[in-house]
Amino acid sequence: GTIPCGESCVYIPCLTSALGCSCKNKVCYRN
């Protein structure tokens, strides 16, 4: 929840979700 994954999720889901990232405020975060 605090580390940006360098990916946005405005139009598509986080592809980095496989790495433990989740969408928050239109940006993918990890932890």
UniProtKB/Swiss-Prot annotation:
Post-translational modification: This is a cyclic peptide.
Keyword Disulfide bond in record: yes
Family in the record: Belongs to the cyclotide family. Bracelet subfamily.
PROSITE patterns: CYCLOTIDE, CYCLOTIDE_BRACELET
This protein's domain notes: The presence of a 'disulfide through disulfide knot' structurally defines this protein as a knottin.
Pfam families membership: Cyclotide
Entry keywords, A to Z: Disulfide bond, Plant defense
Record cross-link Cyclopeptide (Gly-Asn), residues: G1-N31
InterPro entries in UniProt: Cyclotide (IPR005535), Cyclotide_bracelet_CS (IPR012323), Cyclotide_sf (IPR036146)
Disulfide bond entries: C5-C21, C9-C23, C14-C28
UniProt-listed SUPFAM superfamilies: Cyclotides
This protein's name: Cyclotide mden-N
GO biological process annotation, one example: defense response
Role according to the record: Probably participates in a plant defense mechanism.
